[in-house]
Regions:
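Helix-loop-beta hinge of the Bergerat
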Residues: 2-30
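Conserved short strand/loop->alpha-helix "switch" segment adjacent to the catalytic nucleotide/phosphoryl-transfer site
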Residues: 20-47, 95-102, 157-166
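Phosphate/oxyanion-binding active-site loops and adjacent basic polyanion-contact surfaces
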Residues: 11-18, 38, 168, 172
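Conserved beta-strand-loop-beta-strand hairpin that lines the nucleotide-binding pocket
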Residues: 1-4, 51-201
Length: 201
């Protein structure tokens, strides 16, 4: 089953619409109260992540499921040049991107990378954990996986790499990391999509 695709932004109105969408799915699939709350929590976290990651960006939200396997989708077309990104950052209180820590920071950087025309030149070893290129050497398409990121962090912690323990601690604090089975963020052209996977029941 696939729900209607609804427009979303970081607004409270859109959050409530997304939560209603989750409740409709829960009712249709006859989920328990606990399962309904889990679906609502993931929806709310995803919407808050969008607001935190992308600010005023507008996108689309929908839910798909096959039986008890649920996918929450959030997609947006992003066209933000490096110059515009710098302008946005200069408008922040500190004038710098303070977000590149923890799961939220990594996801925010992923959205920035997808929005940045200079994505091919961007490189950060901690951010690249969990990345997979999708296409040839000149392709800007990529996908990030939370599971691959967790696995890479585990290895980094075992090897006592700089920053690995802090990144692991931040991941452990993430509601999504505990509630979701998997989170994937992908870029195809200028379209960024985040999918949260969760099996209920």
């Amino acid at each position: 089953m696939k729900t209607d695709i609804i427009p979303v932004s970081g607004s409270e109105v859109h959050l409530q619409e997304a939560l209603r969408q989750a409740e409709k799915v829960a009712a249709f699939e006859e989920l328990s109260t606990r399962e309904t709350l889990q679906l609502r929590l993931l929806t709310e976290e995803m919407m808050q992540m969008m607001h935190s990651i992308a600010g005023p960006m507008e996108g689309e939200f929908w839910i798909e499921n096959k039986g008890r396997e649920f996918e929450l989708h959030l997609a947006a077309d992003i066209r933000l040049t490096s110059g515009k990104r710098a302008k946005l950052l200069s408008a922040s209180t500190s004038g710098k991107n303070e977000a590149a820590r923890g799961l939220m920071g990594h996801l925010r950087d992923l959205f920035d990378r997808g929005a940045d025309e200079d994505v091919a030149r961007f490189s950060s070893s901690m951010l690249d954990h969990g990345f997979a290129e999708m296409g040839g050497a000149t392709s800007m398409d990529w996908e990030w996986s939370m599971i691959q990121y967790q696995n890479a962090l585990t290895t980094s912690v075992e090897n006592d790499e700089e920053g690995a323990r802090e990144a692991w601690d931040e991941l452990e604090k993430s509601v999504v990391a505990h509630a979701a089975d998997e989170v994937k963020v992908s870029l195809k052209g200028s379209r960024v999509e985040m999918v949260i996977y969760k099996r209920l029941g």
